[in-house]
Amino acid sequence: MEEEIKSLINVGFLTIISVSYCYCLPPRIKSGVLRLLSIFPVCVLLVVLPLFFSFSIFTSTTAFFLSAIANSRLILFSFDQGPLFPLPSNLFRFTCFTCFPIQRQQNPKSQDHLSTYVFPVKIAIFVVLLYVHNDIQNLPRTFLLCLHPLYVYLLLEILLTLLRILMTIILGCDLEPHFHEPYLATSLQDFWGRRWNLIVSASLRAIVYTPVRRVCQRVMSSDYAMLIGVFATFVTSGVAHEVVFFYITRAMPTGEVALFFLLHGVCTVAEVAAKRTAFVRRWPVRPVVSWMFTIAFVNVTAGWLFFPQLIRNNLGERCSNEISLLIDFFRSKLFYFPQ
């Protein structure tokens, strides 16, 4: 346990030094390839930092916050794009917008009242699922595979929403939500583009989709360029998730996670193309029907391709044990009274 805490301190120190460098020197360099080259060593370091840990909770958090979020924002910053442009007023704000999955709200007046009222219900459901966790393990495997997406969604929504509330108080500005009720999605395009993990979607849109579409438009029609941009985004997301899963499990990639995103990429492209046909425009699918098919497809494919690798490596049990060790460690340090 002490080694993990030491690694946490070292990673924190290296991150602060690296981000401070990015705040001070690269902005003095003209945006473009030269600024990207000046930031490149930091990007490499941020990719390596998750390997400092053996605990999966530290590894996954570092991989998401630093290897994914921070790297994508520094790359965009190299070209005067993203949340870091224009340059934040001080180093603290620059560090927060670099390392945390937060983004200034474009339209602060638009408040999602549904999410505000439903959030306590989500917490209650998650607490109930945790309480009955041991009792439902004997249920059919098919039913459990359907519960895994619910577990992951509620966990991410609760943690990231609490982080957003905290950072809103600290920074004094309205921040974008991370999710927009993904269980209400009526299509794959709606699910991935407008409801699921919106902060990551915005980064992928800026780094992958927009450049690929712009390049492809030079040699083909705008519609085909758009479809290629969508598929390229899913390919990139699949590769990134394979890397994150390697960080967490420390097992050789199986390709299942990448296949999950490739499948969703192909189906999303087909869906977008179908919506543009005269047949679908004339006879549109009823929203309730498309909602049922979308949710069923996401859950079935996630249970088939996304979660098996995590289940085989006992990620849930590992996280529970790690949290118990952390609680015991801090309890012994905080409530230790020498004789």
UniProtKB/Swiss-Prot annotation:
GO MF annotation, one: long-chain-alcohol O-fatty-acyltransferase activity
Q: Which UniProt keywords apply?
A: Acyltransferase, Lipid biosynthesis, Lipid metabolism, Membrane, Transferase, Transmembrane, Transmembrane helix
Q: Which reaction does it catalyse?
A: a long chain fatty alcohol + a fatty acyl-CoA = a wax ester + CoA
Q: What kind of membrane protein is this, topologically?
A: Multi-pass membrane protein
Taxonomically, which superkingdom?
Eukaryota
Localization recorded for this chain is:
Membrane
- Pfam families hit by this protein: MBOAT_2 (PF13813)
Entry function: Catalyzes the final step in the synthesis of long-chain linear esters (waxes).
Task: Give the family per the record.
Answer: Belongs to the wax synthase family.
Name listed for the protein in its UniProt record: Probable long-chain-alcohol O-fatty-acyltransferase 7
Organism source for this protein? Arabidopsis thaliana (Mouse-ear cress)
Gene symbol of the encoding locus: AT7
